[in-house]
């Protein structure tokens, strides 16, 4: 009976010392700067003993030694007299812990864990809190760098496109004029750069022919044509006059023929320029010599035609003189005929009384 009472009497001040040491340790930890707590890692394998790493058995199976080696340094610092308490119990009781020592060690393990666990959790939360605070602005910066803020407003001047078949007649006319001006400008730029260009494919002459007003069939507004033609007017002249009045064989009038002639001349000039650009130096020299020969032939022919025209001009003057002489003789003949008629009438008239 004396031994249990003595052991209980010895336990009371020891537990009080243990709790007091824990309180002092917490006060010291509170006085420590926060930087010291941040330096302590959560889990460090360097504090584990080699025996615990080598042994594959659970803690508590090998006795008190295994438990002491597996405890972290925070637990031993929090309660340094725990090992002394266990040694005192072993020395006072004199019992062998190999058989029944598992239960005290097992009971002591949760106690030590319960004593040390609050401090460990508080340190872990203190370590995690500043790390999260550091990661939050860094993540915001990364998101800002990755995603660009949209600072532009949508433009109010939107181009309202409409298909061609939905345009009105005025809009179609403006669109066609704009396209024709643009095409002519582009063709002029390309031609100035020396690039081959195709003729502007337009159907405006068809539209002009289609838009022509119907002729007014009221005959009262037009002057009547002479019913009879003079003798010197031939049928060919009549056909030519009719063709001119109708606007030509193509039905386009004078403006259409001028447009076609201008288009043909432009196309021929472009084709000729392209052919000269594609020719080599020898071919150009040969072409130049041929053109000189052709020019000399044309000049000779022109001189010959001029001489002939001069001769024909002299013949024409003679013919004109003869025509004038003929007219004069005809007039004189008519005058003689009239005089002869008067003499005949006088001869046929009866003699007067005065003459008898």
From Swiss-Prot:
GO cellular component: 7SK snRNP; cytoplasm; nucleoplasm; nucleus
Region (Interaction with P-TEFb): 199-202
Stored InterPro entries: HEXIM
Compositional bias ranges of the Basic and acidic residues kind: 1-11, 24-47, 84-93
Record keywords, A-Z: Coiled coil, Cytoplasm, Immunity, Innate immunity, Nucleus, Phosphoprotein, Repressor, Transcription, Transcription regulation
Biased composition (Acidic residues): 233-248
Keyword GTP-binding attached: no
Residue segments, region Mediates interaction with CCNT1: 283-311
Regions annotated as coiled coil: 280-346
Intracellular or extracellular location(s): Nucleus; Cytoplasm
Region of interest called Disordered, as start-end residue ranges on this chain: 1-160, 209-259, 337-356
Record-listed Phosphoserine modification sites: 98, 103, 230, 234, 249, 257
Expression induction: Up-regulated by HMBA (hexamethylene bisacetamide).
Residues modified to Phosphothreonine: 233
Residue span of region Required for inhibition of ESR1-dependent transcription: 307-352
Gene Ontology biological process: activation of innate immune response; heart development; innate immune response; negative regulation of DNA-templated transcription; negative regulation of transcription by RNA polymerase II; negative regulation of transcription elongation by RNA polymerase II; negative regulation of viral transcription; positive regulation of signal transduction by p53 class mediator
Keyword S-adenosyl-L-methionine carried by entry: no
Name of one Pfam family that matches: HEXIM
GO MF, one annotated term: protein kinase inhibitor activity
Biased composition (Polar residues): 48-58
Quaternary structure annotation from Swiss-Prot or TrEMBL: Homooligomer and heterooligomer with HEXIM2; probably dimeric. Core component of the 7SK RNP complex, at least composed of 7SK RNA, LARP7, MEPCE, HEXIM1 (or HEXIM2) and P-TEFb (composed of CDK9 and CCNT1/cyclin-T1). Interacts with the N-CoR complex through NCOR1. Interacts with ESR1 and NR3C1. May interact with NF-kappa-B through RELA. Interacts with CCNT2; mediates formation of a tripartite complex with KPNA2. Part of the HDP-RNP complex composed of at least HEXIM1, PRKDC, XRCC5, XRCC6, paraspeckle proteins (SFPQ, NONO, PSPC1, RBM14, and MATR3) and NEAT1 non-coding RNA.
Family listed: Belongs to the HEXIM family.
Function: Transcriptional regulator which functions as a general RNA polymerase II transcription inhibitor. Core component of the 7SK RNP complex: in cooperation with 7SK snRNA sequesters P-TEFb in a large inactive 7SK snRNP complex preventing RNA polymerase II phosphorylation and subsequent transcriptional elongation. May also regulate NF-kappa-B, ESR1, NR3C1 and CIITA-dependent transcriptional activity.
Protein name: Protein HEXIM1
Organism expressing this protein natively: Rattus norvegicus
